[in-house]
């Protein structure tokens, strides 16, 4: 019996660091996504206020592309959370495509299409930050989810 208890204790001690490491990694992924959201919000606000039709910057989406699949595989998000976060980052990626297109129009010297693309990008940016047609912002619900995931106590993951 003594040997069994020692074996069981050894087994438990061997797996405890892995559990804590998993929780630390999940929280780190959430922090990376939140940092990216904050940076994106700053850039979207600049896009709306600066009136530069083809800026050189793009909204960062690397952490989302890298970390979110890991969080999905770990079962760290619900379907509703996936939808809200996905809509937010999908809009960010749409804005990036619009900025790429505006940059091409700038290179070609097509000011008419450049201005139209800038207007579209501003509409997308407004929808991201403030919502459209009476709907809520895409940014705030996603940020609330991410903030709630970060604030979860380490033993609850």
Give the predicted meaning of each segment:
Residues 35-157:
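Interfacial alpha-helical end/capping and short helix-turn segments at domain and membrane boundaries
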Residues 1-23:
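Membrane-embedded hydrophobic alpha-helical segments
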Residues 15, 29-31, 118:
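Histidine (H) residue identity feature
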Residues 14, 21, 28, 73-76, ...:
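Primarily heptad-repeat coiled-coil rod domains in cytosolic scaffolding/tethering proteins
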Residues 20-38, 42:
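Juxtamembrane membrane-water interface segments immediately C-terminal to a transmembrane helix
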